[in-house]
Amino acid sequence: MIRNLTLLSKSSLDPKCLILKHSNKNLNNYFKQITFRYYSKTNPIIKQQNHNNINNYNNTTPETQERINELLKLFPPIKYGFAYGSGVISQKGYNRNGDGSTSTENPSKKEEQSPMIDLIFAVENSTKWHSLNLVNNQSHYSFLGLMGAHIVAKVQYMNAKIYFNTLLEHNGIKFKYGVIEYKDLIDDLKNWKTLYLSGRMQKPIFNLPTSSTEGLKEIQEINSEYNLKNAVITSLLMLPETFTEYDLYHTISKLSYSGDIRMKGAENPMKTHNIVINNIDGFRSLYFPIINDHLTQYLNVILENGDEVNSSLILSQNNNNKNNNKNETTTTAAPKMVTFKSKQDPMNYLNLLMMLPGSIKSTMLKEVRNNMKLMKSDEKIDPTILHNLIFMIVSKSSFAQTVKGVFTAGISKSLNYMKLKLKKNKK
């Protein structure tokens, strides 16, 4: 292999580094990755890609984006990734200053209460990624890191199939990150087997600039075609005939928290409201295209004056507002809400059920058949049945992930993490 390498030049970035070319083009791609990782510590250059997409419409400040970029220099390449949470997306109760920290009534506690940045990395080969990450970031791992990347990956594949390193700090930036195999993320977006990450992606997120173009495009398409559409459909089946725009986004946001054991004391019970109220435009950017492309036959959009309009009109107004305020980092005035009215008839109801993810659809259709046997064919299925199905999926994955966290974070970090969550809940 060595004799097939050709010396091109010395690196201008680091005189100790040589730029090599291999006769095998596939190996050249490998060397590019290694070189990027070598430079990441000393002369970090993150290639900024155009991630101006529906998920990236949020209240993330430029300062927060800089902090995220600072963290990304630490890690090996990923296929897709996103940032989420109160440290990234504006939430009521977390009024961030220019440095991305949280304003509080007690300035002395500002640093303590500053929300951490949450990162998710989707990688093609978890064992290889952890192997690379352990070289420079072994301190991020619990005792499992000492057992090697193979063991770390095995633990990752359990349950929700994500491995978290938490309660970390770099240059004053608090953060945690989760690693999932790319194919497992796609599976959750399509089939809702855990709703662990698909639930987070039902809300505004910040797509990482180190995501590959291919990965970003594919995830966006799958998220829109399956995950976001299913979130709207599920919410329509749970909501009454007439409901507000806020009701829709609130119901969607609650899906991934229904059954989450962290909501029983360790997570802020107003979390869903706090997410929605500061990000109405972000939710509109996510869901009006879905409604316009797939669900107009099931929904009317009613303005405050009672007029019915196509959802695309509201979306265009939202985009104009976004362009007019592109230099603002927070919403200065609450956007006007619209009211939805679902077109409830047996055929529409059945059509919506048929679009749900596989296991949920099977159970709901079974209930329909039972109703037909009882001569209740004109009655809708009790929405609590659908709610309970979502509850079971989320509770199973959240409980398993919490237990797994004791091993991936270590007992001490796990206790500290829960303590921080409880403090956050008391705000």
Curated annotation (Swiss-Prot):
Keyword Nucleotidyltransferase appears in the UniProt entry: yes
Compartments where located: Mitochondrion inner membrane
UniProt key word Transferase: yes
Sample GO molecular function, one term: phosphatidate cytidylyltransferase activity
Catalytic activity: a 1,2-diacyl-sn-glycero-3-phosphate + CTP + H(+) = a CDP-1,2-diacyl-sn-glycerol + diphosphate
Keywords: Lipid biosynthesis, Lipid metabolism, Magnesium, Membrane, Mitochondrion, Mitochondrion inner membrane, Nucleotidyltransferase, Phospholipid biosynthesis, Phospholipid metabolism, Transferase
Location of the region described as Disordered in the Swiss-Prot/TrEMBL record: 94-113
Cellular component GO terms, alphabetical: mitochondrial inner membrane; mitochondrial matrix; mitochondrion
InterPro entries hit by this protein: Tam41 (IPR015222)
GO terms of biological process kind: cardiolipin biosynthetic process; CDP-diacylglycerol biosynthetic process
Pfam families from the UniProt entry: Tam41_Mmp37
Topology with respect to the bilayer: Peripheral membrane protein
Record-linked PANTHER family: PHOSPHATIDATE CYTIDYLYLTRANSFERASE, MITOCHONDRIAL
Function: Catalyzes the formation of CDP-diacylglycerol (CDP-DAG) from phosphatidic acid (PA) in the mitochondrial inner membrane. Required for the biosynthesis of the dimeric phospholipid cardiolipin, which stabilizes supercomplexes of the mitochondrial respiratory chain in the mitochondrial inner membrane.
Name listed for the protein in its UniProt record: Phosphatidate cytidylyltransferase, mitochondrial
Species this chain originates from: Dictyostelium discoideum (Social amoeba)
Source taxonomy: Eukaryota, Amoebozoa, Evosea, Eumycetozoa, Dictyostelia
